[in-house]
Amino acid sequence: MAIRLYRAYTPGTRNRSVLGFEELVRIKPRKKLTSGQHSGKGRNNRGIITSRHRGGGHKRLYRRMDFRRNKIDVPGRIDSIEYDPNRNTYICLVNYEDGEKRYILHPRGIKIGDMIVSGSEAPISRGNALPLSKMPLGTTIHNVEITPGKGGQLARAAGAVAKLIAKEGRLATLRSPSGEVRLISQDCLATVGQIGNADINNKNFGKAGSKRWLGKRPKVRGVVMNPVDHPHGGGEGRAPIGREKPLTPWGYTAFGRRSRKIRKYSNIFILRRRRRN
């Protein structure tokens, strides 16, 4: 996908770049497949901030996605490839032979007019959904289920791809985009191929306003806060943090503290932890 670079007409356009939308269709989303959504602004049901740096942004319509891919043995044609403001990948409108229409994540390389199908006897080609038991080793996949029938939960971001590396008994070994290696039931469905829009990481927003359009607010450093707000806060003028090592706003050690529950039931299925950032 082409990346458009801006000239430095203003400070906001200097180094700014956007992705080209040549493969997208500029149409309104299907009304039956959309619904309104409340912007939570990072608050929980009591109004307390649980996810910082969120709020504002443009109003959005939610596109109901088909993560289950449970239209078994019913071929569908890709009618359009559309922009979705709720995720960083594009979406496809699939028109099935029985007349039903659904939105799915856009697999890389899929074009308008291509045919896809779900089922255990589907061919190993991009966009088709099959159980892991029917896929050969080394297959690149996305939208992978963790629990059979629950719908895809792994490898759903733009450019994400997982890899099937082993099968033994009723379990398959999968390498996820984060580097984690884990066991998953071979009855789980997955879609063949990589998610599209892989060049999203090369996009340069250029100015703070572009982030605000997406509902992302500024990240304030703890060292410029008051002591009541952050462990790094306080002091006269530009002061050091006054601690042996950096801390989170809640007093935990920053940069490397494990956030996963120690006694989580699914720990036995994880063969190798994900990479640290």
Curated annotation (Swiss-Prot):
Pfam families associated with the record: Ribosomal_L2 (PF00181), Ribosomal_L2_C (PF03947)
Predominant subcellular localization, coarse grouping: plastid
Alphabetized UniProt keyword annotations: Chloroplast, Plastid, Ribonucleoprotein, Ribosomal protein
Bilayer-crossing regions: none
UniProt subunit comment: Part of the 50S ribosomal subunit.
Family listed: Belongs to the universal ribosomal protein uL2 family.
Gene (name only): rpl2
Compositional bias ranges of the Basic residues kind: 51-60
GO cellular component, one term: mitochondrial large ribosomal subunit
Entries under InterPro entries matching the protein: NA-bd_OB-fold (IPR012340), Rib_uL2_dom2 (IPR014722), Ribosomal_uL2 (IPR002171), Ribosomal_uL2_bac/org-type (IPR005880), Ribosomal_uL2_C (IPR022669), Ribosomal_uL2_CS (IPR022671), Ribosomal_uL2_dom3 (IPR014726), Ribosomal_uL2_RNA-bd_dom (IPR022666)
Single GO biological process annotation from the record: mitochondrial translation
Keyword set includes Glycoprotein: no
Localization of this protein: Plastid, Chloroplast
Name of this chain's protein: Large ribosomal subunit protein uL2c
Chain spans, region Disordered: 30-60
Organism listed in the record: Angiopteris evecta
Gene3D superfamilies, alphabetized: 2.30.30.30, Nucleic acid-binding proteins (2.40.50.140), Ribosomal protein L2, domain 3 (4.10.950.10)
Record-level Gene Ontology MF annotations: rRNA binding; structural constituent of ribosome; transferase activity
Plastid keyword on record: yes
